[in-house]
């Protein structure tokens, strides 16, 4: 029986699942929006939101905790300098999951996961207006 077991297995071993979720978290913090399957997005949200909560206040101990989960100095710096202060007044709900149809190959439900208060890049719109 599956009582009191949290999280999704996603048909992977535990080490593969942890590596995949860490890589997806790094991609989300780098690009601030990624497209993935709905179940992966829901599982990624469980990983990302506590990391953003830790990055609100910049201390050495919190940097070490975040670095132990992310393992990339550039992303940790971006979290504490840019994203953490941006979410300082927000108590939770840092990510948004938007459903975007089904994948053409196997009809898996797809979704965008994005950071809520991200700065949208308007350079493409400026070029199109000219």
UniProtKB/Swiss-Prot annotation:
| Gene Ontology terms, MF aspect | structural constituent of ribosome
SUPFAM superfamilies registered for this protein in UniProt: Prokaryotic ribosomal protein L17
An example GO CC term for this entry is: cytosolic large ribosomal subunit
Q: Which GO terms describe its biological process?
A: translation
Keywords on record: Ribonucleoprotein, Ribosomal protein
Q: Does the keyword Ribosomal protein apply?
A: yes
One Pfam family matching this protein? Ribosomal_L17
What family does the entry list? Answer: Belongs to the bacterial ribosomal protein bL17 family.
Protein name as annotated? Large ribosomal subunit protein bL17
Species the sequence originates in: Buchnera aphidicola subsp. Acyrthosiphon pisum (strain APS) (Acyrthosiphon pisum symbiotic bacterium)
**What lineage is this protein's organism placed in?**
Bacteria, Pseudomonadati, Pseudomonadota, Gammaproteobacteria, Enterobacterales
What gene does the UniProt entry assign to this protein? rplQ
């Amino acid at each position: 029986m599956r009582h009191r077991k949290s999280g999704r297995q996603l048909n992977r071993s535990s080490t593969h699942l942890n590596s995949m979720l860490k890589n997806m978290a790094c991609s989300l913090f780098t690009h601030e929006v990624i497209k993935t399957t709905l179940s992966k997005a829901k599982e990624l949200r469980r990983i990302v939101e506590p990391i953003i909560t830790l990055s609100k206040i910049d201390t050495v101990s919190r940097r070490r905790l975040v670095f132990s989960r992310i393992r990339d100095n550039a992303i940790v710096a971006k979290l504490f300098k840019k994203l953490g202060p941006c979410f300082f007044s927000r108590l939770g709900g840092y990510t948004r999951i938007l459903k975007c149809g089904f994948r053409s190959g196997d009809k898996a439900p797809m979704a965008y996961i994005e950071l809520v208060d991200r700065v949208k890049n308007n350079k493409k719109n400026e070029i199109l207006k000219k």
